Structure formats: structure tokens, C-alpha cells
Amino acid sequence: MMKSLLAANRSEKDSFRIPHSVQQSIPIRRIYTDGIWQVGQKYSKTWRFSDINYAASSLDDRRSIFRSYGAVLNSLPTDATAKITIINRRLNPVDFQRTMLMPECSDGLDYYRGEYNQIILDKAAESNNLVQEKYITLSIGLRKIEQTRAYFRRVDTNLSASFGRLDSGAYAISCADRLRLLHDFFRPGEEASFRFDLSANIKRGIDFRDLICPDGLQFRAGYFEMGGKFGRVLFMRDYASFISDEMIKDLSDFSRNLLLSIDILPIPTEEAVREVQSRILGVETDITRWQQRQNRQNNFTATVPYDLEQMRTESKDLLEDLTARDQRLMFACVTLVHIADSLEQLDADTQTLQSIAQEKLCGFSVLRYQQEDGLNTVLPYGLRRIHALRTLTTESCAVLMPFRAQEIQDPGGLYYGVNAISKNLLICDRKRLISPHAFYLGVSGSGKSVAMKNTIANVALSTNDDIIIIDAEREYAPIARALGGEVIEISPNSQHHINPLDLQDGYEDGENPIAMKSELITSILEQQMGAGLLSGSQKSIIDRCTASVYQNYFHAKGALPMPLLSDWRAEVLQQPDPEAREIALAAELITEGSLNVFAHPTNVDIHNRIVVLDLYEMGEQLRPTALVVALEAIQNRVMENRKRGKYTWVFLDEVYLYFKYKYSGEILYRAWKRFRKYGAALTAASQNVEECLKSETARLMFANSEFLLLFNQAATDRAELSKLLHISDTQLGYITNAEAGHGLLRMGGSIVPFVNTIPRQTELYKLMTTTPGESR
């Protein structure tokens, strides 16, 4: 037997003790605040790693992930034992109601909250209310605690780098979090009751095991009883010649509370090579002796027996793997524990799990009279009390792939549908992102507008945040009014006016307000004169006149009224430059002419919690100007909310209109950068993706946006988005001829296929749909 395996087996040995209480059956000897435990004759520490999109990846991407995961296994230290644990935990109904459902507020909107809650409950039922978590535990032999801490610090750096290359990331968990894992397993349904304060427990003389142990624990021949539940530990006895990379995924997808662990014992390459060479020498010796016996019988043409030839070939192949293909030799052990409410259910679940393994040509067996050792092996203590080891290479071990699909379930986030692969809820908190702004992109009829309204309703019903909507197509008035909002129509024929030259205290935030207003006026004039037609001298005149009209206002320290566009045009007319006449003529229509809606003092009050700025009747000529002016006006409200400590959500439909002109696109980009600092999130929607992508500003905003909802896309748009966002061909399949409400969600570095549909019989659907005859 190899020295490394002998040493590992010796470290697993512990003096046998008959437990006289449930607490004594838990093999934790000592705990430290930094998450290190002494278990038996070993020290252990646990890291959590996040899931990645393996199931939804293309074949090439799967190969890449497979190689990267193999590199993770190769990087494991040879003087430690690794345990990869997948935990399936059913959501506690009380916790689910507290964290996922909207509480009633008695504000007249509880009917809609009830519909939302029912939608979430129905979707959660389809996913069996399961949460999957993944951990890796490393354990080493006893040594001084200072040396142990230094060792795990080095390992922490290596694990973070290795899993980081997989876009997964590994994070060490605290002592309290490790205890919580055991508490949630031993006491299912009581997850919310766990409390751990080490210093307080020491003062009160409370053993930490008292906080996590079940009410009772009794081991039988082939199962165990735990606090009114029944459990059984299985181990993988038979391995297929070619194991499917989906076997672990299929087992862990089983809709019960279960833990699946893969114990991995890496062997140093030098020792593994010596062992394989020794085996080759032994096989060659056996073949030579067999041939000598045949020669003594005058049988000089006999063929080497198949079993000996097979052993020689396999041993040589293994040696080549170790010496030429960067493979390492590993011992592996797969164990699984599942829990049920009754013994009958436990037996049925065991048969189902064994059938899943048999479909992949593998076999799981019950640990007879070893249930306690099996339980201590499968739980993330860092122990291995089962000796059913299988010799594997790195590639063979990497086939036991723990990854399935990325999940996004942020505490306190908003509901964005369900994961199309796992059917789990997608709960996203955009506020935690570096940039909370978002794009919703899709062709007409793909569900983009419904998703916008869905987000608006979610924010309105589950938070106290303010909502402002710039509505270019008159789509959002019904849902805004239903949620208690106000709709302000701005048109040449209305009495509502917005002065684009308004300055709010703090507007500039360290920047030059004159330069910013000059850019705004340039954008307005560009839309009147045509994109790219403003000369350098005309821009200089615009900037000079803008500074001049604000001069008196600043000298009066706010005692005078804000300047108007008509004041600005009068200043232009006083300029001696011949280009000034052209500028004044272009500005005449929007200052003195029939489209002078923005040449009046602001008389719009947008202090309602939900406000829609309806620009539908502005007409094609004035609508781009209206979009820019409305966004400029919203900035004042955003800054006011910032001072009050209130978050603001701003929604922009048909955002492609901003990118038709250079300066309006730059104004939007400026708001995109600044609103994050002001405590506001912008959400922009467009069906004309190709039109947007013609703008370098838009491409930059897309690439830097950390939240995207991509619905069904045209072929040309898919190709552009694939290049810009690095979306694989398999992922593109989710936005190719996709049904309404289906697509891809990108949040941070995660890309998840999603489904977000609203039942047709609900009032929410009638408020959100744009289908003629179905909307309110």
C-alpha cells in the first residue's frame, strides 16, 4: 500500500468511544473562531464555492470547464484530504414566507401583493423549494494550531485563485456558518432558530454541540433515526468504465434533503509514478514467467493471456497519463445521505437514487452496520471513516462534476422569474452591484415591456423606493394609476412644462454646471439642425451664451428666476457672429414657435412616489428633445431623494432614441455614470438593438452594464450581442425564436436562462400585457 494512503488511514483512526449522549456522537473535539475545527486526529476548514453554468454550456465550453476543474483538483495539496460536499436543503415555509413573499401593508395594493405571492408560491412549488449549496473541506493531520492557521492561509489563496479561474470563487466560511450547516441538517425545519455567540456560550457554560445536535440519534443496521426523521447513508460501490459527467448533477437534483460528498485523496506524483512502475514490473515479471512455462512445454508461439496483456496496457497508459499528460493519481470515495419523514418514504427514495446511478452504469449500496461511520464521512467534518476508495486519475475524478447551473437568490432582492434549467426562483438585488443600471432588450412581442412593468410593480409593492418613468409610447399609465401613481402628460397642447435650464442645488456634484447645461442645449439644437451639423464655432457660441444667461442668476445668488430657453435665444441674437443667426433660427421653433413647450418655467410637481412623464403626444420632431429634457429634470428629483436617503428607480422606454444623436447619447451616458452615486438605478428598454449598437456610447454602456435581460433577438442582433457580451452559442439558443417572457439574464458575471411569465387570469397580467384586447 502507498505511504500516502497509509498515512491518511492512520490519521483517520481515532480511539473508539461509546457515546453516552447525542452530543458525544458528534466528532468535533474543538472549534476556533476562524472556522478551524479539530475533528478526531485532524484539523479541518471549509470553503464555500458558487455554482457555474455547466448544464447550459456548449460542448466546447464544457470541455473548457472540465479542464479548469481538473486544474483545481491538481492544485489540491497532497498532504491533505479534500471533501467536496453538495447540500440540498428544502426551504423552510416560515423562512420562505418571511424572505420571499410580500407582506401586506393595508395601502389598497394588497390584492396585487396577493397575486404576486401566489405566482411566487406556484413557481417555488415547481422547483420543490430546494436550495443547493456547495462546499469544499480540507483536513490535515494534527500539528500546532499556529502552523495549522498558516497552512490554511496558504491554501485559502490557492483555492481562491483556482476556483476564480472557473468563475466560481471559493470563500472560507466562519465557525458559526459551519455549525449552521450541521444545525440545518440535524434539525430540519428549525433553520431560523440557530443562534451562536461563542463568548456568550463560554460564559454560560454551553457546549456548542448542544446548539446543533438533534433531539435523538439512533443507528440501525441499514438506516438511522434522527429527531423524528429517517436517514440512510449510501456509498458508490461500482464505477462505470466511462462515468457520465451528469451523474452527480442527476443525483443532487433529487428533490429531497440530502448531502452528497466526494472524498479526494491526492497522491504525490513521484510516489504514484513509483507505484505504477512497480506494478508494470510485476506484470512484466508475470508475463515472463508465463512465457518460460510455455517454452518448457515447447509452446513457442503461445499468445500472452488477455488479462495479463490488459493489465500491462492499462498500467502503461496510466504511467503515460502521470508522466506526459499532467494527470495525478487520486483516491476517491462517494457517499450520500438522504432524509425522509417515514421509513417507507426512505426506502422508496433509496430505490430512486440507486436507479439514477444505474442509468449511468454505476452502483450505490447501503452501508450495513456502518451508518454512523458513513454519516461522519458524508457530513463536512473533514473525516473519512469509510474505506471504499477507488483509484482515479485527475480526468476520471473531474468527471464527478459538482457544477450544474448558476443560481441567483439575493436576500431582499426582486423576483425576476425562474431559472430555466433548475426551475429555482431568480431573486436579484441590483443595489448590491457596482452599477445597478439595466438594459431590457428584445424584439417586439418578446416580453420586454411586460418585464419592465413587472419590475415596476415589484419595486412599488415590495419597497418604499420612488419610481419615475419616461413613457414615450403611452404604455405605462394603467399600471402607474393602479399602483397609486400620477401620470403627467407633456405635449405642445398641455399646461405642463419643464424648464431644461433649471439648476438644483448640488446639480454639478463637482463638475462645471455651465458646461453640462451647454452640452444639454447643444443636444437640443442638434436634434433641430440634424446630427453632426453643428460646427465648432457654433458650439463655442452656444457655450458662451449659456455662461452669459447664468451670470446674472449666479450673481443674484438665486434671488432671480431661472433663465429660460427664450432668454438664452435672446442672448444668442445679441452675438455679432454670423453663425449666431443660424443658431437662433434653429432655436426659434422651440422657444418662440409652436413647439415652445420647454421655453416656460417648470410647473410640474413630480413628488408623487410613482410618476409617469407621458411624452406620447410630443410628435416625432420634438420627442427626442423631450426625452433629454425629461431625463435632465428627473436628475433634480434623484438628488433630492439622495439627501432624504431614499432610493430612486428610473425607467426609460425606447432608449434607442437617445442614441440617434451624439449629444443626447452622451447626456444619457453621463446620467448612467452619475445616478449610481446618487442612489438611483436606471432601467432602459429597446426593441431596436441594431440601432443602439451603431452608437459607440451605447456599446460601451451595454458592455459595462451589470444587469441585462435579453429576450428573443433578431439574427443580426444576436451576432452583435454575442461578440459584445461573450455569450456562447448554447446560451444564444435561449434568445433564438424564444417564447415571450423567455431569455437570458446577466447579473455581474453570471448568465442564467430564465422564464418569467404572468398567468393570464390575473389582474397583474391585464395591467402589464400589450396584447390588444387583453390589456386594461
Which residues fall in each region the model found?
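Extended, folded cores of ATP/NTP-driven motor/assembly subunits in large transport
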Residues: 1-405
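Conserved lysine of the Walker
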Residues: 448
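Hydrophobic positions on the alpha1 helix immediately C-terminal to the Walker A/P-loop
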Residues: 451
